[in-house]
Amino acid sequence: MNEAVSPGALSTLFTDARTHNGWRETPVSDETLQELYALMKWGPTSANCSPARIVFIRTAEGKERLRPALSSGNLQKTLTAPVTAIVAWDSEFYERLPLLFPHGDARSWFTSSPQLAEETAFRNSSMQAAYLIVACRALGLDTGPMSGFDRQHVDDAFFAGSTLKSNLLINIGYGDSSKLFARLPRLSFEEACGLL
């Protein structure tokens, strides 16, 4: 049986964590990015399908390729973030299922239903993006996830000729708390949940 994590860990992962828009000039090492993936890959996905593919943009050249896809409200915070992760999904993720889910012919579930394949890839890569955010927080990093961008431009600029399609962007770094907005409310249990 698992033990509950400490109240301090819960604060770090959830209640005190914030979405950041400003960043300190502290780099994020390649080793840290590898450590992030080493954590987030263990989050569950349907049939262990693991459809997310991540491009970590760290260079000025990479940010310039990304710039035309960004909405005006997301431009500055993305260009100044130490890292911007493009979380994409592989439309042919099922080709890896003989390795990832060897218990049966799971590949055929998706090759026979393109709609199921797309829904599964998008939904599960979104879950994996959430695992990446939690992994960042666990390692002392801050994040700024965004869906306000031109996905077609990102796909053309970074994934042309491949089976990858962009899902969302996540800025990663060490946040500047002086640039945080006042915390916004969340729905109560009664507003968001039901008991049957």
Swiss-Prot record:
Pfam families with a match to the protein in the record: Nitroreductase (PF00881)
One annotated GO molecular function: 3-hydroxypropionate dehydrogenase (NADP+) activity
InterPro entries, per database record: Nitroreductase (IPR029479), Nitroreductase-like (IPR000415), Nitroreductase_HadB/RutE (IPR050461), RutE-like (IPR023936)
Keywords: Flavoprotein, FMN, NAD, NADP, Oxidoreductase
Induction: Up-regulated by the nitrogen regulatory protein C (NtrC also called GlnG) and repressed by RutR.
Cofactor: FMN
Catalysis performed (reactions): 3-hydroxypropanoate + NADP(+) = 3-oxopropanoate + NADPH + H(+)
Cross-referenced PANTHER family: MALONIC SEMIALDEHYDE REDUCTASE RUTE-RELATED
Function of the molecule: May reduce toxic product malonic semialdehyde to 3-hydroxypropionic acid, which is excreted.
NCBIfam families hit by this protein: PRK05365.1
Protein name as it appears in the record: Probable malonic semialdehyde reductase RutE
